[in-house]
Amino acid sequence: MRKPEVAIAASTHQVKKMKKGLWSPEEDSKLMQYMLSNGQGCWSDVAKNAGLQRCGKSCRLRWINYLRPDLKRGAFSPQEEDLIIRFHSILGNRWSQIAARLPGRTDNEIKNFWNSTIKKRLKKMSDTSNLINNSSSSPNTASDSSSNSASSLDIKDIIGSFMSLQEQGFVNPSLTHIQTNNPFPTGNMISHPCNDDFTPYVDGIYGVNAGVQGELYFPPLECEEGDWYNANINNHLDELNTNGSGNAPEGMRPVEEFWDLDQLMNTEVPSFYFNFKQSI
């Protein structure tokens, strides 16, 4: 059985055999000659066969990142930047897969370039776009609020000026009590009894509340009686007779000289309302 001191000494001797740290030019030349002549294989065997006191991981990283012939040097081109941004949007932080799609670039190099340059640039562009959007939306809200305030001020000014004119006596106080329920008051219209059968048709077309705030009045097309018309004609004839028909001009003579009023009023005229109901 081997003594513990001997086993510890052997293990420490093996550890001391593996070199760490910077690579010397002689080590780089040994690794390059072996890789060009034998090709890539198991990296532990490469370290042993090349006569290097390095581990397999150290040989692999040295070859991929520094010694391989197709390795690109220098800054990234704009095309490479676009590819990195596109691949990163698809693959995320899988730098080895991104490097496999960019010939001549290493995963460590791509990761450092992303964190130092591209990531900051994209963040700055997003902040600028958000600032532009906020500045473009703020004038619209300001214009809307200013228009609303201006309209409210205009209404207040109109009402205030109207009240001041009323206080000074320029406006009749009775004008302030305007009936809005009926825009055509019946007091100022000629009253006449007419048939209301046409009212449902008017309501069906224009609606019941077709006025400003109340019902819009449409005179019916057919009337049952014509007393109001006869009364107005008779009053007009009386005035002409009182003033003297002989002195009146030829165009202002009484109507009886031209036609018979009784016969005219008793003549049956086809009604539009009757034809309208028949067509329906």
From Swiss-Prot:
Q: Name one GO biological process term.
A: positive regulation of DNA-templated transcription
Q: Where is the HTH myb-type domain?
A: 15-67, 68-122
Induction remark = Slightly induced by salicylic acid (SA). Positively regulated by SND1 and homolog proteins.
| Annotated PROSITE patterns | HTH_MYB
The free-text tissue note of the record is: Expressed at low levels in stems and siliques, specifically in xylem.
Keyword Phosphoprotein present in the record's keywords: the answer is no
Q: Where in the cell is it found?
A: Nucleus
Note the DNA-binding span(s) on this chain: 43-67, 95-118
Cited Pfam families? Myb_DNA-binding
Q: Which UniProt keywords apply?
A: Activator, DNA-binding, Nucleus, Repeat, Transcription, Transcription regulation
For this protein, the record's CDD domains field holds: SANT
Q: Which SUPFAM superfamilies match?
A: Homeodomain-like (SSF46689)
Deletion phenotype: No visible phenotype under normal growth conditions, but the double mutant plants myb48 and myb83 nearly lack secondary wall thickening, stop growing after developing one to two pairs of small leaves and subsequently die.
List the record's Gene Ontology CC terms alphabetically: nucleus
Superkingdom classification of source? Eukaryota
Which Gene Ontology molecular function entries are recorded, alphabetically?
DNA-binding transcription factor activity; transcription cis-regulatory region binding
UniProt region (Disordered), positions on chain? 129-150
Give the misc comment. Plants over-expressing MYB46 show a significant increase in mannan synthase activity and mannan content in plant.
- Stated role: Transcription activator. Involved in the regulation of secondary wall biosynthesis in fibers and vessels. Transcription activator of the mannan synthase CSLA9 that recognizes and binds to the DNA consensus sequence 5'-[AG][GT]T[AT]GGT[GA]-3' cis-regulatory element of CSLA9 promoter. Transcription factor that acts as a molecular switch in the NAC012/SND1-mediated transcriptional network regulating secondary wall biosynthesis. Is directly activated by NAC012/SND1.
Can you say what this protein is called? Answer: Transcription factor MYB46
